[in-house]
């Protein structure tokens, strides 16, 4: 009983930050900026963590750690209720292929540039690459337990998602206005936005800026990228196990991220449309709360001084990936459209 009682202060603090972030994310000003509850939760957590948290750090430690680890995994699993496999059919094979090519090329470019050219550490490169190539802050959060990454590196990766994802959200609609006279449809724009923008909330805003139809296509394409998170984490876990075996005959056991497998199972279950709409909305609201609490807890344990020490290289890597998402993402979209139509 004492063990569970020790969780209460930190859990209450994490959930309080999450509740405030969810409320703030619904404000018109925040919606217009495409700032999700996850982003606001980590910002709020960092503000508290670098000011008054030290006064309650000791009694809150266990609950904050629980939020970062257990609530995070539960949140990723429940995230599957936002998806159905029918979503894939809505954009067809071309949407899936575009997402797969953008994800793979962006992550491989991140690894090559980050490690070979910028000399960044492996954890930072993988976290930034995952955030840019898959689904922003949620991907960074989900990758953290597989890597056992440091909180400061996670916070830096999330910061790059916020900076460049927000830039994309404003820039993509402007780019479309400049090229729509070339006959590029709103459906094609939606595919491009969904396959290249970092966060789901940012994809919603970028699509809505053009039309409701573009927004629907962007969101579905984006959610297919989210669905690719599970196989990515399993592949990453297998690669890390093989790498850390050091080439010895006895391979290190693959630490399968079961929460990622459960995420896919939940998405599969959700595809049968068995749950009432009202219950599904309640589950999704709970999921938002759990993920925001995990982000708030992460912010509480992130020190600004450590982020400063990371220097400019993480931003340089993220900016290069941003450029690739514009140019490379555009070429991939155009190439697949030409190939399949």
Swiss-Prot record:
Membrane topology: Multi-pass membrane protein
Keyword Hydrolase: no
Keyword Transit peptide: no
Name recorded for this polypeptide: UPF0324 membrane protein CV_0763
Chief place of localization: membrane
Domain of life: Bacteria
Stated family: Belongs to the UPF0324 family.
Keywords, comma-separated and alphabetical: Cell membrane, Membrane, Transmembrane, Transmembrane helix
Subcellular location per the Swiss-Prot or TrEMBL entry: Cell membrane
One Pfam family this sequence matches: Cons_hypoth698
Regions crossing the membrane: 7-25, 35-57, 88-110, 125-147, 154-176, 218-240, 253-275, 290-307, 314-336
GO cellular component, as recorded: plasma membrane
